[in-house]
UniProtKB/Swiss-Prot annotation:
It is found in: Cytoplasm. This is Clustered mitochondria protein homolog. TPR repeats lie at residues 1034-1067, 1076-1109, 1118-1151. Residues 1289-1303 have a biased composition (Basic residues). GO terms for molecular function: mRNA binding. It comes from Sclerotinia sclerotiorum (strain ATCC 18683 / 1980 / Ss-1). Keywords: Cytoplasm, Repeat, TPR repeat. InterPro entries: CLU-central (IPR033646), CLU_dom (IPR025697), CLU_N (IPR028275), CLU_prot (IPR027523), GSKIP_dom (IPR007967), GSKIP_dom_sf (IPR023231), TPR-like_helical_dom_sf (IPR011990), TPR_rpt (IPR019734). Belongs to the CLU family. Residues 335-579 form the Clu domain. GO terms for cellular component: cytoplasm. Residues 7-24, 915-930, 1242-1253 have a biased composition (Polar residues). May associate with the eukaryotic translation initiation factor 3 (eIF-3) complex.
Length: 1311
């Protein structure tokens, strides 16, 4: 919880929300525990904020602390522990007027405790646990704690680069030879630099003591335990003195022991030292301690706090490129206490870490959720619990994969073995016992457990009373898929003869069907939410059973009396169109098994829930419109205006409302706040227009096409109808959803994916399964969609490689996996350097494993190529070109493969071609700092942070293999680590999302004050529920920073954007697509706040990331480069600005063609830039080109055409005038020295939408209000050049159309 105290935009928050601003300001020192701004509670009870004084036993004797009446005393304690003036206290209680205050009551419940009251901090006697916690804490505070032994998270997990990026800018500014701006010499076409992904080397912090550890005399003998001895410590100060310290119930004191003699009694005066806090005792023992501790705090204060907090509620991101093992950042240091930390944290019995996960999950779910307070507490607990469980399950899964845990059934085959560790039940995601024999065996089992996690997450999100799910995690590690589940009470119970193991759904395959009535009510609620139809199934005897859910979805009545739902891999129907196409829709399982090699690997091809939701919305809209039309016909008397108003409202409500569910009485009611205002004047009309959506019926049968045998004609007819309904949804996917997505990307209407992960997320959001990547690649036809085709092919290749590599890695002993991975990577990516790579296997190591399957040694580039092509044909129905290996982007494919397999590679120059290796060999040693396959671009000087390290490590072994005559790209030593890839089922916070949505709606309705209060409330809820370091919090920081940017709250926007960057770096990855977009938005906001050089630094870093993630010339980089050009104009760097506009235009012409509307828009801007650069002739030519395109594409009457024509005339007339005025510019600029206000930009920067988001949505605008070209006249341009436009700086200018909306949008703007 420590992290949650450092929250947030303080005084920079909007002044008109004083209460919320004050609340946020105070959260630096106090964690607001669920302050409730809802109207249902009284304003005062909503969380009154006031100041208390804490009286301390020693200096500074008193400290003020800001608290909220809703806070628990426990949170106040935590705040005191975190404050710099009081962090030596950890074992204490609080008293008010001599009465001890219970830690678990709220401040408002303490009698007589009001503003300016005094509470006393009273030190408690230590217990052994408190003493251990105190010691761990002091070690961390004084910088004596090394890195913890971590078996789960990889090298530099959770790293942030923002400090490095920002410091690069400030260092450059501080030098006399600093370039005039960060973009000097930037090379647009250079390949990516791996060092972009690593932080700069930092100076180590000052040392406060040499060492502190548990003494060899620990633990105390029995007779001394009786006297209050808890632990013995050993401390060596910076002065070199060694002290033996006793941890006693009364505190800490120096004892008489030495390394050879045991005497834990206190030393006598003058050497006697004792204190309640170990921190205070260390200050007494070491003369230099106070000074070095102060310097350490100053050193820590230079770092961004968010970058140093421990990540507790999310999985830290694991970078795929990491420093070499000997780099200072990760060098292994001797630390005796590293091995003792588990004991210090968990105690001698280690029992404190064992938890009953299932009971915790279910009892948390049973917590009340009536009030907002209840919901905050419940969701906060849920979030932490899922994070803890995911962590424990992933750690256990790695131990299972490494063979460290004994199976419960050692006589069974490997894939059928099950394990229990740390109260988590583990099994392999393979078909060990033949359950999926007819569905595709191991492949089907692997797919099923992945789908199961998704199903469990959906059920967790729905939060249905009385229905419980086990904790579920799937871990992929070195080719193995391992499922970790919390142990459901009764799942292992031996049932009596004739009694089923399962109470609802299929038992033992589908031969027996159980349908216990107790499950009907909860499964009915689940099915309604998931659009699942109640339907008949038949057992092996042909007996009919009516089930609420799929036959595969099972209900189990636990011995704890709770109803559990299991096996949620089939909550949606099978994709029959796909199955018929790929040969898996065969009636006979045996036929399917012996189907050709090209058949899809399994029959678990279900449609996505997002597709069902999208289809439901379409059907609902059709039905609503039909009903309205019917009512109109029936009620001719109602005024036409009232009639025409309603359909939009209903259709919008059905689309915009997140939970398109009917209200209690089954009516599609408007949101309360809207209906209060809107529905009041015309209640009778509204009542007549209201439609009862309870009459709308839509549900799908998930067991359609799954081999059910209806018995009667009536049953057959109904089943045929169910199957037809499923077919329509499958057709909707192919005929509507896929083409729409491709068209949106073609028109530039939405943010473009930049890597496999963002492409997958976009497909999933639209309800498209990954198996349709082949169709996406086929539909991505033409120059405009070339980027999409390249991405889709790259993603298919990386996924196929993952499957091929998994087959070789699955049963390979761990010490041989690096050789396997390196060889497979050489066969995939290193063939230009060495066409016949040989595996580098340590034969002595291999000899230790005589049974190991070393078939990877036989893999050649040709065989791997064939395997990948076959996998892509089977899984994606796509045939690669014969030249695909020549077309792959080496660096980007290496990144995709590493992320999918969890590989962490050493940061060094990887040579993919002979040319790059020759260049590197010929280069002087000093250039060894840049980790790319090409020479470093000139603009990359700031990234040479690894120079020293690489120069030191530039041995031939780091580039070539053992056999120097045949160099290879990758060696086994380059694979420093592999980390697990985790799929988990934690739900999102519905409460925090509701507040965010309500805030957005209020802003759209122009209720600015209410909107901002709700947004702040949502921010507070996100932080309380998730903790600060969580991907959802990064997303809300980013959304709010954009909204504040729109509201002109620049400081608050800047603070939130910085936090968004750090949190997404640490939880999603330093090169994740969301992180990159967060950097771009931070750049925009920094520019708007007047820090244009810093903004360009952020944008340069984002472009450097882009080169690694995608390569040059990404369609969305048109906007980014354009924004950078506008910023350079602000810095009066007119010539450089012009080259950036030209670069943007070049990419635009490549992607959209020379005669596209987007090209015309950019030509228009470039002409202005050329005019500023005093190149009047080129300016006139470019404006003429722009005018001609607008004229051809939009016609003479279009406002864009007219605008361009006006500019063209004036540019031609005033060419002479510009030349004349240009002479005065420098003198005037030097005299004035005024920074141009961002409001009077000639060009305007554009917001960067998230992948799949429209530009309008990113800007918080209505899509209907697209903007036209810059309407300023040439005279204003002249004034701008001369710096005389300052007088008008408060006058808002209409913006130019957004080049981000490539194509259709610009056209729309002009119509």
């Amino acid at each position: 919880m420590a992290a949650t105290n450092e929250v947030i935009p303080t005084s920079e928050n909007p002044s008109d929300v004083s209460g919320s601003s004050q609340k946020l300001a105070t959260e630096e020192t106090a964690l607001a525990n669920g302050v409730d701004h809802e109207e249902e509670d009284s304003g005062e009870a909503g969380g009154e904020v006031f100041q208390l004084t804490v009286v301390l036993p020693r200096e500074p004797h008193k400290i003020p602390i800001i608290v909220s009446s809703q806070e628990a005393i426990h949170d106040v304690r935590q705040s005191i522990i975190e404050l710099p003036g009081t962090f030596q206290y950890s074992c204490f209680h609080l008293e008010h007027k001599g009465e001890r205050i219970n830690d678990f009551v709220q401040i408002s419940e303490v009698p007589g405790l009001t503003a300016d009251s005094e509470i006393h901090l009273v030190e408690d006697p230590y217990t052994e646990k408190e003493a251990r916690i105190h010691i761990v804490r002091v070690r961390e505070l004084i910088g004596a704690a090394g890195d913890r032994t971590d078996t789960l998270n990889g090298i530099i997990s959770g790293v942030s680069l923002l400090d490095s990026v920002t410091s690069a800018e400030s260092t450059q500014n501080g030098t006399s030879t600093a370039p005039s701006h960060p973009m000097v010499g930037f090379d647009f076409q250079a390949s990516g630099t791996l060092s972009t992904l690593l932080p700069k080397a930092q100076e180590p912090g000052p040392k406060t003591i040499k060492s502190i550890s548990v003494s060899p005399w620990n633990p105390p003998p029995y007779h001394l335990r009786q006297k209050g001895h808890l632990l013995y410590l050993q401390v060596t100060t910076n002065e070199g003195e060694q002290f033996q310290i006793t941890s006693h119930v009364s505190g800490f004191y120096v004892n008489k022991s030495s390394t050879g003699k045991f005497d834990p009694s206190p030393k006598s005066a003058p050497k006697a030292h004792s204190a309640h806090s170990l921190l205070a005792l260390l200050g007494d023992l070491s003369p230099s301690f106070e000074d070095s501790f102060k310097r350490l705090q100053e050193y820590n204060n230079t770092k961004e706090p968010l970058a140093t907090f421990q990540i507790t509620n999310a999985t830290p991101s694991n970078p795929w490129i990491v420093p070499s093992a000997s780099a200072p950042l990760v060098a292994h240091q001797a630390d005796i206490t590293r091995t003792q930390e588990n004991y210090l944290i968990a105690g001698i019995e280690n029992s404190e870490t064992l938890r009953d996960w299932n009971e915790e999950f279910q009892s948390t779910r049973e917590l009340p959720k009536e009030t907002v307070q209840d919901r905050v507490f419940r969701e906060r607990l849920t979030s932490k619990l899922f994070a803890d469980y995911n962590d424990a399950a992933a750690r256990g899964a790695i131990l299972v994969a490494r063979g460290e845990i004994a199976p419960l059934n050692p006589t069974e085959g490997k894939d059928a073995q099950i394990f229990v560790y740390n109260n988590v039940f583990f099994s392999f995601g393979a078909d060990g016992v033949g359950t999926f024999a007819s569905e595709g065996g191991d492949e089907a089992a692997r797919a099923a457990v992945g789908k199961d996690v998704m199903g469990v997450r959906m059920v967790n999100q729905l939060d249905i009373d009385g229905l419980f799910t086990p904790g579920t995690v799937v871990v992929d590690y070195l080719g193995k898929r391992i499922v970790g589940q919390s142990i459901v009470p009764g799942i292992f119970k031996q049932r009596d003869p004739g009694e089923n193991q399962i109470d609802y759904g299929a038992v033992d395959g589908k031969d027996i069907v159980a349908s216990d009535e107790k499950f009907v009510s909860v499964f009915e609620k689940l099915s309604k939410a998931l659009k699942v139809k109640k339907h008949a199934v038949w057992d092996k005897d042909g007996k009919r059973h009516d089930l609420e859910g799929s036959i595969e979805t099972k209900g189990l009545l636990g011995t704890d009396g709770r109803k559990y739902v299991l096996d949620l891999y089939r909550v949606t129907p099978l994709d029959i169109t796909w199955m018929e196409e790929v040969g898996t829709a065969l009636d006979s399982p045996k036929e399917a098994d012996v189907a050709s090699e090209s058949a899809y690997p399994h029959r678990m091809t279900v449609i996505r829930p997002e597709l069902v939701e999208a289809y439901w919305k379409v059907k609902m809209r059709e039905w609503v419109n039909g009903e309205l039309e019917r009512k109109r016909q029936a009620q001719k008397t109602i005024e036409p205006t009232a009639e025409e108003k309603e359909p939009g409202a209903v259709a919008e409500a059905s689309e915009a409302s997140k939970s398109d569910e009917p209200t209690e009485n089954g009516e599609l009611a408007k949101k309360a706040d809207e209906s209060d205002k809107d529905a009041e004047p015309s209640k009778p009309a509204a009542d007549q227009e209201r439609i009862d959506i309870g009459d709308f019926k839509f549900a799908l049968n998930p067991d359609a096409f799954s081999g059910q045998q209806p018995q009667t004609d009536e049953e057959k007819a109904e089943f045929a109808e169910d199957e037809q309904q499923v077919r329509l949804v499958c057709e909707f996917l192919r005929k509507t959803v896929l083409p729409e997505l491709v068209n949106d990307l073609k028109e530039g209407d939405v943010g473009f994916p930049m890597d496999g992960q963002s492409l997958s997320r976009l497909l999933h959001k639209r309800g498209i399964n990954i198996r349709y990547l082949g169709q996406v690649a086929t539909l991505a036809d033409g120059k405009r969609l070339e980027s999409l085709r390249i991405l889709a092919v790259q993603e298919m290749v990386s996924r196929a490689f993952k499957h091929v590599a998994g087959n070789y890695l699955r049963y390979l002993p761990i010490p041989l996996t690096s050789s396997c991975i390196a060889h497979l990577l050489n066969c995939l990516l290193g063939t230009d350097l060495n066409a016949t790579p040989k595996p580098d296997v340590d034969e002595a190591m291999a000899a230790l494993y005589p049974d190991a399957d070393l078939k990877f040694k036989e893999v050649s580039p040709e065989s791997l190529k064939r395997d990948i092509e076959a996998q892509i044909l089977r899984r994606f129905r796509y045939t690669l070109d014969s030249t695909w290996t020549a077309a792959i982007k080496h660096l980007q494919l290496l990144r995709e493969v590493s992320l999918k397999l969890g590989i962490q590679l050493e940061m060094k120059p990887y040579h993919f071609t002979k040319q790059s290796q020759t260049e590197a060999a010929a280069a002087p040693p000093t250039t060894n700092g840049e980790a790319t396959k090409d020479a470093a671009p000139t603009g990359k000087s700031t990234n040479g942070k690894k120079k020293k390290k690489n120069a030191r490590e530039g041995s031939p072994a780091s580039i070539t293999s053992v056999n120097a005559s045949s160099p290879v790209t990758f060696n086994p030593d380059d694979i420093l680590n592999t980390v697990p890839v985790i799929k988990e089922a934690s739900p999102r916070s519905s409460l925090a999302e509701e507040a965010l949505e309500a805030g957005r709606i209020s802003l759209l309705q122009d209720q600015k004050k209410l909107g901002q209060e709700l947004l702040l409330e949502s921010l507070s809820l996100h932080e309380q529920i998730y903790g600060i370091l969580h991907p959802e919090v990064a997303r809300v920081y980013n959304s709010l920073s954009m909204l504040y940017y729109q509201l002109d709250e620049k400081e608050a926007a800047m603070e939130l954007a910085r936090k968004a960057v750090i949190v997404s770096e640490r939880t999603l990855g330093v090169d994740n697509a969301e992180t990159l977009l967060n950097y771009l938005n931070l750049g925009l906001i920094a520019h708007a706040s007047g820090e244009t050089k810093l903004a360009l630094t952020y944008i340069k870093h984002a472009l450097d990331l882009w080169k690694v993630v995608y390569g040059p010339n990404h369609p969305d980089s048109i906007t980014t480069i354009n924004n950078a050009a506008v910023m350079l104009q602000h810095l009066k760097e007119y010539h450089d600005s012009r080259t950036w506009f030209e670069a943007s235009l070049k990419i635009c012409e490549e992607v959209y063609g020379k005669h596209s509307i987007n090209a015309a828009t950019l030509l228009f801007q470039l002409a202005q830039a050329l005019a500023l650069d005093q190149d009047s002739k080129s300016a006139v030519n470019r404006m003429r080109e722009s005018y001609n395109i607008f004229l051809t594409e939009l016609g003479a009457e279009d406002k864009n055409t007219k605008e361009a024509e006006k500019w063209l005339e004036q540019l031609t007339q005033n060419a002479v005038s510009i030349a004349k005025h240009a002479k005065d510019v420098q003198a005037r600029r030097n005299r004035a020295g005024i920074r141009v206000s961002p409001r009077v930009t000639l060009g305007q920067t554009q917001l960067q939408p998230q992948v799949g988001q429209t530009a309008e949505a990113a800007a918080g605008r209505d899509s209907r209000s697209s903007r036209g070209l810059d309407s300023r006249s040439i005279d204003e341009l002249l004034k701008f050049i001369e710096g005389s436009d300052q007088a008008n700086k408060n006058k808002k200018r209409p913006g130019r159309s957004n080049p981000k909306r490539r194509g259709g949008a610009a056209a729309a703007a002009g119509k």
